[in-house]
Regions:
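Short, surface-exposed "cap/lid" segments of acyl-processing enzymes
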Residues: 11-13, 23-68, 97
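A domain-start/cap signature at the N-terminus of enzymes
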Residues: 1-7
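Short beta-to-alpha linker loops that shape the active-site pocket of alpha/beta-hydrolase fold enzymes
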Residues: 39, 63-73, 139, 243-245
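Terminal, non-globular segments
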Residues: 8, 18-19, 65-67, 228, ...
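Catalytic nucleophile-loop/oxyanion-hole region of alpha/beta-hydrolase
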Residues: 72-104
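Active-site signature of alpha/beta-hydrolase-fold catalytic machinery across serine-
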Residues: 121-125
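The alpha/beta-hydrolase serine catalytic core
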Residues: 128-269
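Gly/Ala-rich beta-loop-alpha elbow adjacent to hydrolase catalytic centers
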Residues: 110-119, 137
Length: 273
């Protein structure tokens, strides 16, 4: 198995940390994959999952680049620097780096949660040219997402302390739509909170420049409606329902697998279908 190569890339003023998994037995015209990771605790929760997926893809002849957005993970910068416009540019920087390392490849972006949202935003600006987007439960409603993060944050506090601090739940009930300054150990900058508040399904229009596959659960009516609206605009998008045993924000436990095999198989298959 090829050892992934860790490195920094991008402009000197905004370096990004990446891990490149070179393809074994690569052939001209092969697919290469850019992993667009989730935000905060969701990114930490899926770190090992995407590591295993990247290793599997490399063995199958698919070069893969994993990276941390500026101000997150092992990339330079502070959490307070995190915001969607900068991360969108980071994604295109990562795309250009993968193009440099796999020059003859068809590049597919695999974006999970807020990483999927950023993939939509980056792909439509014309600066980078993915052949395909695979969006795994993308965040299409920023306020709904922020409320979920707050609820999970309060639930984590409840399970951490012997005597739960009821002030957190009272605040959640009193201001259900408020944007959190912190969620599950990760700060949300003022700019990011403003951007999430403005994030709606209507603000995430797809383009016809690439194919898009959306993977989500069968009970996610909002994402299904968004995909249907994109199809009504004759965008090349397809919705596929997919259930898995990975809880985005919790530690692994019997009902939340760390690296569910069905999810690995589904995402690997999604590159070519």
């Amino acid at each position: 198995m090829t050892t992934p190569y860790p490195f920094l890339f991008g402009p000197a003023s905004r370096q990004i940390f990446g891990l490149f998994h070179a393809a074994e037995d690569a052939q001209p015209g092969n697919t290469a994959v850019l992993i667009c990771p989730p935000f905060g605790q969701e990114g930490m929760r899926t770190h090992r999952f995407f590591k295993v997926l990247s290793e599997r893809l490399a063995r199958a002849g698919v070069a893969t680049l994993r990276f941390d957005f500026y101000g997150t993970g092992d990339s330079p910068g502070d959490e307070d620097d995190g915001e969607l416009d900068g991360w969108r540019r980071d994604l295109c920087t990562a795309h250009e780096e993968l193009r440099r390392r796999a020059p003859a490849s068809r590049i597919v972006w695999v974006g999970a949660r807020l990483g999927g949202t950023l993939a939509v935003l980056a792909a439509r600006n014309g600066r980078c040219d993915p052949a395909r987007l695979v969006l795994w439960e993308p965040v299409i409603d920023g306020r709904r997402y922020a409320r979920l993060l707050r609820e999970q944050h309060v639930a984590a506090i409840d399970t951490t302390f012997c005597i739960p601090d009821l002030a957190w739940r009272r605040e959640l009930s009193r201001e259900p739509g408020a944007m959190p300054e912190e969620a599950l150990g990760t700060s949300l900058s003022p700019t990011l909170r403003t951007q999430l508040a403005a994030l709606t399904p209507e603000s995430l229009a797809l383009t016809a420049l690439h194919e898009t596959l959306v993977l989500t659960g069968p009970d996610d009516e909002q994402t299904a409606q968004w995909a249907a609206e994109q199809q009504s605009r004759y965008m090349p998008v397809r919705l596929a329902y997919f259930q898995h045993r990975l809880d985005w924000t919790s530690d692994p436990y019997p009902n939340s697998a760390m690296v569910p095999a069905d999810a690995l198989n589904r995402l690997q298959g999604a590159l070519h279908e």
